[in-house]
Amino acid sequence: EDKAPSVRVVVHETEADAGAVRLGRAIAAHVRACTCVVLGGDGTVHELLEGLFSDAQPRTISIVLVPVGTGNALYHALMGPDTAPDPAWRLGSLDAFTQAQAAKPLTLMQADPGHHLASVVVSHALHAAILRDSEALRAQYPGPERFQIAAEQHLTSWVHATLTLLPDEGHPVSVYDPSSRSFSRPAAYEHSPDGRVHVSGPFLYMNAMTVDRLEPSFVPAPFASPTAPAPLRRPARAMDVIVIRPTRQPSASSPDAFASDVLMPVLFQGMYQQGKHVDMQYEERRPIVEYFRASGYIWEPARDDALARTMCVDGTIVDCGERAIVRTTAHDVHVFCA
């Protein structure tokens, strides 16, 4: 008679901020390969991965994700935006695991300083400011409304920095052209001989993403979806970088006017409408949103701009100092999903 394979199950519970980092380190001290069933959200996955890969040893990690966190972007990106009243939608990854379906690889980003790992987003400017300030509001507003309150404080916050987009061997930096609906070499931008592309601020929005959405219906990077059309779909070792620079507007406007006339339509008629912002253009057909694809980037804040030094790595707020360097990694991480 066949016997079921022996499976050792260990249950852990995190108790404080960064508790999953300590848990990941403890697991890494004993195993080189494991399957982790995570009851949490993006922050828990982020912390767990940081702990698991805190040393230089290669590991093979599989994740079964049960989305019960504040932010569940990774789950919704892989399993769809369903948030029906029936909680069964939360069990898709677990069902895929129990049915022995193949797990899908994750693209991780490493953000320095700090060797932080992200499976969803590394951001600066607006998104980073919202995440930073929302923490101060958590006690008074424990629900998602604190993010809206924080956003209202920063809709007119332009940050000053220089962005350098990095190519990889065989994968040059590219930019989406809404006129042709394709990615191409960014010929109109300043280049270095090694293929780096230089973008000057000020910036209002700057997110590097390996998934398409940050909320079930909020889709800043639609081409990072595994279901995006094949010619537009993000390759495995790339990140999609979404940028809004206010001074690209043909007629100069104040931060208040830009927020009401440009940013709000981009957010609510674009990002909240399944990513339609990628095709929005000014009158002379200049894209409002710059949608880059790269293997990494360097972010260099202006010395006198404290907000520009704020970096968000899957919800963890980091002061990046004089420079942040972010690249995709080769870590072997898979998630079970249908």
Residue ranges and their predicted role:
Residues 1-39, 44-46, 50-57, 83:
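ATP/NTP phosphate-donor binding region
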Residues 57-211:
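Catalytic core of DAGKc-family lipid kinases
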Residues 20, 45-46, 214-216, 320:
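Short, well-ordered alpha-helical microsegments
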